[in-house]
Amino acid sequence: MTSLNSSASPTSSSSDQSDATTTTSTHLSEEEAPPRNNNTRKRRRDSSSASSSSSMQHPVYRGVRMRSWGKWVSEIRQPRKKTRIWLGTFVTADMAARAHDVAALTIKGSSAVLNFPELASLFPRPASSSPHDIQTAAAEAAAMVVEEKLLEKDEAPEAPPSSESSYVAAESEDEERLEKIVELPNIEEGSYDESVTSRADLAYSEPFDCWVYPPVMDFYEEISEFNFVELWSFNH
């Protein structure tokens, strides 16, 4: 009996030790291992923040995507098909957007939604609606040198003329019209009296001699000039 008890005791002690080691190892493994759910959540948050920051830093254009290495690609879906026309890889987003506008005008016409509608009349037109011709015209549009004034045309419209400027313009027009009218005589102070006196001089301009009486002659001298016939000089 004693031999059996002695042999059983070491086995029980060894089993207890093994149980203790397993429990401690499990506790250590649980403490050392980080939770998986927290890591996945952090990664999702980082990716969402990165995508939001990238969208805020770069402009968003229709039909344009940004590659991970910094280039911009443009493509457009063919009408009534599942395939897309690859327009190319470009350095800037504006170049890719202009390429997309050319393809959209060719495929959809006037109903196309453009990234730069103010440049529609300046874009090159492809020779046909084939994918190759569309790609060629898109590359030409992307290489265009566009002035900033054309892009800011719609953003900053011209200010309407002020009331003061319109009044000055109307006044200048009236002055030009008055210059075309025949110039009237200038009537100043005293000119009316001068005209009256001049008219009086013209109306009553008679020679001065008419107003001078002839010299008084002697009565007898005046009679002697005439030969009087004697009325009672008849001979009987």
From Swiss-Prot:
Residues 1-60, 152-174 are annotated as: Disordered. One of its GO terms (biological process) is ethylene-activated signaling pathway. PROSITE patterns: AP2_ERF. Residues 1-27, 161-170 have a biased composition (Low complexity). It comes from the Eukaryota. It is found in: Nucleus. The keyword DNA-binding applies. It holds the Pfam family AP2. One of its GO terms (cellular component) is nucleus. CDD domains: AP2. Residues 60-117 bind DNA. SMART domains: AP2. Its main location: nucleus. InterPro entries: AP2/ERF_dom, AP2/ERF_dom_sf, AP2/ERF_TF_ERF_subfamily, DNA-bd_dom_sf. Keywords: Activator, DNA-binding, Ethylene signaling pathway, Nucleus, Transcription, Transcription regulation. Induction: By UV LIGHT. One of its GO terms (molecular function) is DNA-binding transcription factor activity. Probably acts as a transcriptional activator. Binds to the GCC-box pathogenesis-related promoter element. May be involved in the regulation of gene expression by stress factors and by components of stress signal transduction pathways. Belongs to the AP2/ERF transcription factor family. ERF subfamily. This is Ethylene-responsive transcription factor ERF036. It comes from Arabidopsis thaliana (Mouse-ear cress).
